[in-house]
């Protein structure tokens, strides 16, 4: 066996290997012994046909094709060792020719990360003030959630809840036909057609109304675009929303912890502030990681992106499946996008995640941010604080190698982000240098 070609580009090595005739013959003998037990040959019991007869029966070309499974994996591994290549993942092997017996292998190599001067990274974290209007909006939402619905003896208004009979066609074909349909009259509603709610305003219970709506040419659902829906609607019942009175009693009923409406508003403010702070922190950290990646030299094998891409697509499919109402709807949505479309869509995200993971991982090892055993044990104690009688059982679970390993990764990521966050929040370098110059001038003037 000899390596006839070897190339290393970035994080991938490529080799071409030619097997000598002796190795091929030894391999063919092994292939013969494996296959002869499976193939029925006239005139011989299974497994007893001589090799020359067997080879004529199945053909030498077939034998050489089967030989690939018998000798290529081992030969590839030996060639990698002989060339002192350190693979990061399983090589991808392809046959070049079977006569002579030549194969090629693409071998992923470990990623390489050279960090930039990360101590110069600076970023600004947004501060968001919660306005009274924002709190008013949430309070209004809570009021509507606690509202009751009462029958109204009047024409339909926006915001009403209707019970109605609907008959309709779409370009003459049956469309939406319901005997008892509940419908919330909203100006922004687009179902069953854009502007449908507006046609219901001023209708009176018991009196039918007919109208038509043309779907816009650029409608999101192509099967509806440009078509005309003809409706006949009879309102059976009109209900109007009755909001509870907004006072201290309402706040206390909502949560016994609140004695006043002010306390409810304060809790809403705190919750909104927490969410906004979390968003600001996430945006801040995204800026930092992006800067770290941009200033660093990061090279990685394609297999890392492929693995991350597979995981992202799997997560998206699971999320999609959980949000649809039926398997048929799920299949219909899948039919609108090919695997290639999904790979193209999510590839940039996969590449960003790989680069981010490698850059932060390198930073963690450079600054020795991997937690020690004491830190991991302390975190486990926090996690099992509320476990009660099952503390020891929970502790044993967290100390299982795989679970403890994930916890170490989590703590490492947390410490690494805290480290780089602190750097990024320092004053801008220009300001620090300017201050140093001023101090130096002051000292000279004092002399």
From Swiss-Prot:
The keyword Ribonucleoprotein does not apply. GO terms for molecular function: peptidyl-prolyl cis-trans isomerase activity; protein folding chaperone; ribosome binding. It is an enzyme of class 5 (isomerase). Keywords: Cell cycle, Cell division, Chaperone, Cytoplasm, Isomerase, Rotamase. It catalyses: [protein]-peptidylproline (omega=180) = [protein]-peptidylproline (omega=0). The keyword Chaperone applies. It is found in: Cytoplasm. Residues 159-244 form the PPIase FKBP-type domain. InterPro entries: PPIase_dom_sf (IPR046357), Trig_fac (IPR005215), Trigger_fac_C (IPR008880), Trigger_fac_C_sf (IPR037041), Trigger_fac_ribosome-bd_bac (IPR008881), Trigger_fac_ribosome-bd_sf (IPR036611), Trigger_fact/SurA_dom_sf (IPR027304). GO terms for biological process: 'de novo' cotranslational protein folding; cell division; chaperone-mediated protein folding; protein transport; protein unfolding. It holds the Pfam family Trigger_N. Signal peptide: none annotated. One of its GO terms (cellular component) is cytoplasm. Its EC number is 5.2.1.8. Consists of 3 domains; the N-terminus binds the ribosome, the middle domain has PPIase activity, while the C-terminus has intrinsic chaperone activity on its own. NCBIfam families: tig. Involved in protein export. Acts as a chaperone by maintaining the newly synthesized protein in an open conformation. Functions as a peptidyl-prolyl cis-trans isomerase. Belongs to the FKBP-type PPIase family. Tig subfamily. This is Trigger factor. It comes from Dehalococcoides mccartyi (strain ATCC BAA-2100 / JCM 16839 / KCTC 5957 / BAV1).
């Amino acid at each position: 066996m000899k390596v006839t070609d070897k190339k290393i580009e970035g994080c991938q090595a490529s080799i071409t290997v030619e097997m000598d005739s002796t190795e091929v013959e030894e391999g063919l003998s092994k292939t013969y012994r494996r296959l002869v037990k499976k193939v029925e040959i006239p005139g011989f019991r299974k497994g007893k046909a001589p090799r020359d007869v067997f080879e004529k029966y199945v053909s030498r070309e077939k034998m050489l094709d089967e030989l690939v499974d018998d000798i290529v994996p081992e030969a590839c591994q030996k060639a990698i060792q002989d060339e002192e290549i350190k693979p990061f993942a399983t090589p991808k092997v392809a046959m070049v020719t079977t006569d002579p017996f030549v194969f090629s292998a693409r071998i992923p190599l470990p990623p390489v990360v050279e960090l930039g001067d990360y101590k110069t990274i600076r970023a600004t974290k947004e501060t968001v003030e919660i306005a009274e209007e924002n709190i008013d909006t949430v309070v209004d939402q809570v009021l509507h959630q606690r509202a009751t619905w009462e029958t109204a003896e009047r024409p339909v208004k926006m915001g009403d809840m209707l019970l109605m009979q609907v008959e309709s066609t779409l370009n003459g074909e049956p469309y939406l036909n319901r005997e008892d349909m509940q419908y919330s009259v909203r100006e922004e509603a687009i179902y069953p057609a854009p502007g449908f709610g507006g046609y219901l305003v001023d209708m009176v219970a018991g009196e039918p109304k007919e109208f038509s709506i043309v779907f816009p040419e650029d409608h999101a659902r192509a099967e509806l675009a440009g078509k005309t829906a003809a409706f006949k609607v009879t309102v059976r019942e009109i209900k109007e929303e009755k909001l509870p009175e907004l006072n201290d009693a309402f706040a206390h009923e909502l949560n016994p912890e609140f004695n006043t409406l002010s306390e409810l508003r304060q809790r809403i403010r705190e919750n909104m502030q927490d969410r906004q702070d979390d968003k600001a922190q996430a945006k801040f950290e995204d800026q930092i990681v992006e800067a770290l990646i941009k200033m660093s030299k990061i090279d990685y094998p394609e297999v890392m992106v492929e693995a991350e891409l597979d995981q992202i697509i799997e997560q998206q499919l699971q999320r999609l499946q959980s949000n649809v109402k039926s398997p048929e709807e799920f299949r219909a949505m899948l039919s609108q996008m090919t695997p290639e479309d999904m790979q193209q869509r999510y590839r940039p995200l996969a590449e960003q995640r790989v680069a981010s993971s490698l850059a932060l991982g390198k930073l963690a090892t450079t600054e020795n941010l991997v937690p020690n055993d004491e830190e991991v044990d302390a975190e486990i104690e926090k996690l099992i604080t509320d476990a009660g009688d099952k503390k020891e059982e929970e502790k044993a679970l967290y100390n299982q190698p795989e679970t403890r390993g994930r916890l170490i990764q989590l703590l490492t990521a947390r410490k690494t982000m805290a480290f780089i966050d602190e750097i990024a929040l320092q004053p801008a370098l220009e300001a620090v240098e300017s201050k140093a110059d001023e101090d130096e001038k002051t000292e000279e003037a004092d002399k």
